Amino acid sequence: MEIKGFSFSAVEAGIRYQDRLDLGLIYSDHPVVAAGALTTSLVKAAPVLIDIDRLEDGCAQAILVNSGCANACTGEAGMEVAFVTGELLAKELEIKPENILLSSTGVIGEPLNVRAFRDNISPLVQGLAPDNFEKVAQAIMTTDTVQKVCYHSVEIDGVDVHFMGMAKGAGMIMPNMATMLSFVITDAQIGSAQLKEALTPAVKKTFNRITVDGDTSTNDMVLVMANGGAQNSSIKSGTQAAEDFQGALQYVLMDLALKIVADGEGASKMITIRVCGAREDAEAEQVARTVANSSLVKTAFFGEDANWGRILAAMGRAGVPFDPYQVDISFGDVTLVRDGLAVGRSAEDTATAILKEKEITVCIDLKSGKCCEEVYTCDFSIDYVKINADYRS
């Protein structure tokens, strides 16, 4: 798929890695509507701080992204380098620096090498082409083992609207947009306020429902650019068109979010924690998230041990009131716990077979209300420890 008016490029800049793409560019041939959801961590990387300011007017023309260095916890020097990289690109593209969104991912606390940008901005711009989307997806990878892209089309008011999305992330994943990056482009005609209205709930139901290790990055961001090329009637708030657009955007973000979980560092299984019977959605989510972030639960899944006691124990510290002797817990369609008590050894043996699968659903019924939520996670393997122990070496 290609979206007319957008082009892409990626080069090997040697920022940290050798012989691999690590500097990417997404470019629109004219300023377009833009919106973002950025990390809510108090510790924010330089590009995040800059983008928060630049997104205020809801307009952008380019996204410049690098991997290998997060440019986080680098002080005023890091801010200055970030501004310089944008100015270098603006000069080469002959556009306003304020219309360039910046993004970085990689090691925290190390200075970003501005020379890598000075030497490579020109070839980066020269390499712009409408079919280089997946090269940028490769350039943003760090500990990812696969690139993550999604292509989607939907009919809005009788017009085909197209979406192209990419993401990176495998570790330091528990986004709270508010390390994980996602960029989506679309040819939908939509205002900046309406784009933000669609993005906020879509992120809440997708990227903010995943966790690999419970850590929130300094650099988390989702950026969306819409150029209006589909020439649909401009999408208005509260209309069917707005609902259709949000649904399509949420589809793309969910596809990318689940790919991040499936590619979690060292992961061998993707796990859905579904909590029902809660009094409120927030309580259901909190219980699900607490279980999903439990290291003991995640290692039990890796060991293919149907240790439901760890799940119930994690639920008990979620800060949500419930009666333990009303809780049911199932792995897939196998009930292990009914009214807070073990069903029996034969049920555990059957559940153990389910744990050998690559995708597992844990169903928890609190029997306190009618609200349900899901959180998506993965297991903790020996490789997770190795990957993170060796990350900077």
From Swiss-Prot:
Active site: T179
GO cellular component terms listed in the entry, alphabetical order: cytoplasm
Subcellular location: Cytoplasm
GO biological process, one term: L-arginine biosynthetic process
Site feature location: Cleavage: A178, T179
Residues that bind substrate: T142, K168, T179, E265, N388, S393
GO molecular function, one term: glutamate N-acetyltransferase activity
Database matches in Gene3D superfamilies: ArgJ beta chain, C-terminal domain, L-amino peptidase D-ALA esterase/amidase
Annotated site (Involved in the stabilization of negative charge on the oxyanion by the formation of the oxyanion hole): T105, G106
Subunit structure as annotated in this protein's UniProt entry: Heterotetramer of two alpha and two beta chains.
Protein name: Arginine biosynthesis bifunctional protein ArgJ
Species annotation: Desulfotalea psychrophila (strain LSv54 / DSM 12343)
